[in-house]
């Protein structure tokens, strides 16, 4: 995720062993890939346009479990990201977490209160530039296929009901990785729409009636 007025900051997820903050924290490997779980990193450009060494985000965000797919509020002080814990006694599921930045440091991530249960998977958050809606992926009951795209209105520190983006966006396949460019333009990946094979990138535009 590129960020900054000059797009000179890049936030990304990686399984690399960190060299900076958090390197001594307890770690676990993914039960799916067997690799080290993903953490979030930041890399910046210097005044000459060269990328500096990546730095791991604070332990308040990165844990021994998976973190990924960050999205930022317009002022850059709120980060939404995917958090996926491993529970030996139950299914592996993903949730959306929120972290606030103060004095150039990210605070402890907290669960976004979008669903009441702990079974429905949520992930790949993308906050609209105007801050009104959070777009995300879910396997919630009543969708059109495997994983669908949803959105929820941001109401202060809470969220309104989940809204499925409908059959023009969602298919019997999987739709994932939404990115809202300007509050009316949505980019996403899908293996259900006709394409080149597997996940392809698609674009949709919101019309004046609120329909994609």
Predicted regions and their residues:
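Short, conserved micro-motifs composed of acidic
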Residues: 1-212
